[in-house]
Curated annotation (Swiss-Prot):
The gene is hpdB. 4-hydroxyphenylacetate binds at S348, C507, H540, E641. Glycyl radical subunit of the HPA decarboxylase that decarboxylates phenylacetates with a hydroxyl group in the p-position. Active toward 4-hydroxyphenylacetate and 3,4-dihydroxyphenylacetate, forming 4-methylphenol and 4-methylcatechol, respectively. Is likely involved in the catabolism of aromatic amino acids such as tyrosine fermentation. 4-methylphenol (p-cresol) formation provides metabolic toxicity, which allows an active suppression of other microbes and may provide growth advantages for the producers in highly competitive environments. Its EC number is 4.1.1.83. The modification Glycine radical is found at G877. Heterooctamer consisting of 4 large (HpdB) subunits and 4 small (HpdC) subunits, arranged as a tetramer of heterodimers. Also forms a catalytically inactive homodimer. GO terms for cellular component: cytosol. It comes from the Bacteria. Transmembrane segments: none annotated. Residues 782-902 form the Glycine radical domain. This is 4-hydroxyphenylacetate decarboxylase glycyl radical subunit. InterPro entries: Gly_radical (IPR001150), GRE (IPR051215), PFL_dom (IPR004184). It comes from Clostridioides difficile (strain 630) (Peptoclostridium difficile). Pfam families: Gly_radical (PF01228), PFL-like (PF02901). It catalyses: 4-hydroxyphenylacetate + H(+) = 4-methylphenol + CO2; 3,4-dihydroxyphenylacetate + H(+) = 4-methylcatechol + CO2.
């Protein structure tokens, strides 16, 4: 009798003396027929037993060719470097794989890009070298130190050095990394950015904002691409040979012709040459895998496995040149192109887009011809899920853990509408849901673009998937998304039809797309794909509660002893004065961060611009211009990201109520209580980052009254206009302020209101707040989720609070709910979940996502992480393995209000 997936994993873990527990057993039992294929289970086992590995092969060949081509046109020089790197990647095929290729020669991992950012490796170079020397004498016992981070290499062991708290690198590769990093000192995007940023007269303010974590990180060199939607149209419609031929013809037409533009018109020749160079590198990479598959076929003795290798050879040799003929070939090509895209740059959030609609032409024709069965399609999609989950993003420890939580945000959107306004749901999208229910991996996360035109059975299927506790699909209001597209991109020619092509880029960034006409075997299909720049580069995460803290502290950060803003020297005698100073500080922050980011991105586009993503997205090939020259159709995508909105709103409400309306306490008494953390230890000392289990040190009771009053003050999420109107006023103001900001492309910006994981580290950097939150504890998640435990009047009261403002005028908002599994048990429970979701979206909510798990399970998983290797939770726009999350985020998820009735 065959084992279930859970039994299989349990047996593997128990063989290592690890106990296994599974979330949502009651809901899982409803769908106990949902099992991944044996092949997918085996490959998932490989993933569970694989560590994230940093590899120097790609950067070595990139760097070598880049030096060799010194003096060439920058975009061509970069293309040659990418070509060399792809051409020399060592192929690695795991037994049983039907979808092959990966970021590096390792099953899971990534690589550093010192040409983008090298300071971390230079600064840590000596430490890493010393650690590499020391490791030679380490004993096997030190292996036991690792484990609680899942696949993260959080500590060095054996022959492996931990880098950025996530990746393991073989000690012999460390000197190569350090040497290469030193070569880029003063030349990297990061260093050049810093050099020119310092020419801003208010550069010190920018540095202070970064040092105090009011701003989380510089996006211009950390993650310059991503949080956008890829476009697979050109490879799928023309094949790689076809794109080369197109570029060659365009070269002939534009060589020496400025076409009325004496500046960038001449750049077209160099861009088309760069396209040819890069695609030739991709073709070599694919064909190297074909050669490797042919070799494996030659030594394989099992006839079935031998045939599988033979099939891989045929598929890879074909897609290296031509339009895919079958569903499997199309799936392999899109996956290959996706890996190529994320290998080009430091990228997180290169989202897949409307995948079920993109691959539908091949699915439809293969099914009609009897070339494939639905079960075979589901297995391929399961294997695809595992491969996407293997993608890692190399970034600093602060970005990887503090922002991304190790996630890469390859979001796949389902539902929505077609170009003509009819439902976008199709049978392949149902199979995507089925595959995600059988093979529960964090990637690709699913997002349902909810529209009233979508079929009920399709929506019920999605609700069933959500019930399993994997955190997806998240639900997004399709109407809100198209409204925002029309508002933000009207100046660039956005139409209603094209607005329907949007999808989610990254975890929750609404990203513009377009429709292209794909022809397969004489039949034409309209498919959507990305058509815009990064929808998540710009000002990266302003800590709203921290700005308020500095208002109260006269511009000074007492934790760091830094005078961040010029002292306002105002007595703050009125609530209006507090608001006035807050707005002034906030606008100062946006302004200086916007200009610094513009400099960083300008240097990036000049020296490290995208070629792969440029050739993929409209209208770069038509214009002959890369992303840096606004080759994309839509360029008004850069944003201002914020964090801790509800913590800020609750704090304003407490100040207004206690200090200014009721006059129960003076502003000085409030400041004193905040500076002394209401008589408690800092969360960093306690080691718990939610409000639970905090330790009181003041024995006099000096702060008891004000602390209780702050906790009892009006809170957002209870349909109480006292607090909710503060949110409304803030949102209206923020939208206008962001529109006044201007990106390097001279386009207006807009608010992006997601926390990802920044509410952990930014909360850790913030003193106590007037709402009663203690120093160092995590902020509220998302942007319209209630602060943990403060939503007392039920979920529908929370919905009323969240929709007090027009969520369609900004890029996004974020609502997280935690439901006990028994709340939505059975078919009626599924309907209840769908009705709950509908209720919020029909009221104008933009986004809602669910954790269907009980808090006791999470608490046990925190104590015994190795027992819950496959447990996943929804954080803030993304799903991640519990054991790969940092403790501040774990504490926040545990503390969220758990609804047992809806």
């Amino acid at each position: 009798m065959s084992q279930s997936k859970e039994d299989k994993i349990r047996s593997i873990l128990e063989a290592k003396n690890i106990k296994s527990n599974f979330q949502n057993k009651e809901n899982l039992s409803e769908f106990n027929e949902k099992k991944a294929s044996k092949r997918a289970e085996d490959l998932l086992d490989v993933y569970y037993n694989t560590l994230s590995t940093a590899d120097m092969e790609f950067p070595y060949w990139y760097n070598r060719e880049y030096r060799k081509s010194d003096g060439d046109i920058p975009v061509v020089r970069r293309a040659k470097a990418l070509k060399a790197a792809f051409s020399h990647m060592t192929p690695n095929i795991i037994p049983g794989e039907k979808i092959v290729m990966q970021k590096t020669r390792h099953y899971r991992g990534s690589f550093p890009m010192p040409w983008v950012s090298e300071s971390f490796f230079v600064a840590q170079g000596e430490q890493m070298r010393e650690e590499a020397k020391k490791l030679a004498s380490n004993t096997a016992d030190e292996l036991t130190k690792f484990g609680s981070g899942g696949g993260n290499v959080t500590e060095s062991f054996g022959n492996v050095v931990s880098i950025a708290g996530k990746f393991g690198m073989r000690k012999e590769e460390v000197p190569v990394l350090v040497k290469m990093a030193k070569e880029w000192v003063g030349k990297s995007v990061e260093d050049l950015g810093f050099h020119y940023e310092k020419m801003m007269p208010d550069y010190d303010l920018k540095e202070n904002l970064m040092s105090t974590l009011i701003c989380m990180f510089d996006s211009g060199y950390t993650l310059p691409q991503g949080r956008e939607v890829i476009n697979y149209f050109y490879p799928l419609n023309y094949g790689l040979d076809g794109i080369i031929e197109m570029a060659k013809e365009c070269k002939k037409a534009v060589a020496g012709n400025a076409s009325g533009d004496g500046l960038i018109g001449m750049d077209r020749l160099y861009f088309y040459e760069a396209v040819i160079q890069v695609i030739e590198g991709l073709q070599t990479w694919i064909l190297n895998y074909a050669k490797h598959a042919k070799y494996l076929e030659s030594i394989e003795t099992d006839l079935e496995a031998k045939k599988e290798y033979s099939d891989l050879v045929e598929i890879l040799e074909h897609i290296a040149h031509k339009q895919p003929r079958t569903f499997r070939e199309a799936l392999q090509l899109t996956y290959t192109i996706h890996i190529a895209s994320v290998n080009e740059d430091a990228i997180s959030g290169m989202s897949i887009g409307r995948f079920g609609q993109i691959l539908y032409p091949w699915y439809e024709q293969d099914i009609e011809k009897g070339l494939i069965t639905k079960e075979e399609v589901i297995e391929l999609l399961e294997l695809y899920r595992i491969k996407i989950t293997c993608i890692d993003c190399f970034a600093s420890a602060g970005v990887n853990g503090g922002v991304l939580s190790g996630n890469t945000f390859n979001t796949l959107s389902i539902g929505g509408l077609k170009e003509d306004g009819s439902t976008g749901a199709n049978e392949l999208e149902e199979l995507l849901l089925e595959a995600s229910m059988r093979c529960r991996t964090p990637q690709p996360s699913l997002t349902m673009l909810y529209d009233e035109k979508l079929p009920e059975d399709f929506l019920m299927k999605a609700a069933e998937c959500t019930k399993l506790g994997s955190g997806y699909p998240a639900w997004v209001n399709n109407s809100n998304g198209t409204t925002f597209m029309m508002k933000q991109f009207a100046d660039e020619g956005m139409t209603v039809e094209e607005a329907r092509a949007f999808a989610l880029g990254g975890c929750l960034e609404t990203s513009p797309g377009c429709w292209k006409q794909l022809t397969l075997n004489g039949k034409t299909y309209s498919i959507a794909g990305g058509a815009g720049q990064s929808a998540g580069s710009g000002v990266h995460f302003i800590a709203n509660p921290k700005i308020l803290e500095l208002v109260l502290m006269n511009g000074k950060d007492y934790r760091m002893n830094i005078q961040v803003f010029e002292p306002h020297n105002k007595p703050l005698d009125t609530y209006e004065e507090v608001i006035e100073v807050f707005k002034d500080y906030y606008k100062q922050a946006i302004n200086v961060l916007e200009r610094a980011n513009n400099i960083e991105l300008d240097i990036w586009r000049k020296f490290d611009t995208s070629i792969i993503n440029s050739l993929l997205k409209p209208d770069c090939l038509d214009k002959g211009q890369h992303i840096g020259n606004m080759g994309y159709r839509y360029n008004a995508t850069l944003n201002v990201e914020t964090c801790g909105t509800v913590t800020m709103v609750n704090s304003f409400a407490a100040l207004k109520k206690l200090v200014y309306d009721d006059k129960a306490f003076t502003i000085e008494e409030m400041k004193d209580a905040i500076l002394n953390n209401f008589g408690f230890k800092d969360a960093l000392e306690v080691g718990n980052y939610s409000m639970a289990d905090q330790v009181k040190v003041d024995k006099t009771g000096k702060y008891d009254a004000i602390y209780k009053a702050c906790l009892d003050a009006p809170k957002y999420g209870n349909n109480d206009l006292y607090a909710d109107n503060i949110l409304k006023n803030y949102e209206v103001w923020l939208s206008k302020v962001c529109e006044e900001a201007q990106s390097l492309y001279a386009k207006k910006m807009y608010p992006c209101q997601i926390s990802v994981s920044t509410h952990g580290p930014q909360g850790a950097a913030t003193l106590a707040t007037p709402d009663g939150r203690l120093s160092g504890t995590t902020y509220s998640d998302g942007s319209v989720s209630a602060y943990a435990g403060t939503d007392k009047n039920g979920v529908y009261a929370l919905f009323e609070s969240a929709t007090i403002w027009d969520q369609a005028v900004v890029q996004n908002s974020q609502m997280n709910l935690k439901l006990h599994p028994t709340t939505i048990k059975g078919q009626q429970g599924t309907k209840k979940l769908l009705d709950l979701t509908r209720s919020y979206l029909r009221k104008g909510g933009f986004h809602i996502q669910y954790n269907v798990v009980d808090s006791e399970t999470l608490k046990d998983a925190q104590k015994n992480p190795d027992n819950y290797r496959q447990l996943m939770v929804r954080v803030a726009g993304f799903t991640q393995y519990w054991c790969e999350l940092g403790k501040p985020i774990q504490d926040e998820v545990i503390a969220r209000t758990e609804y047992e009735g809806v």
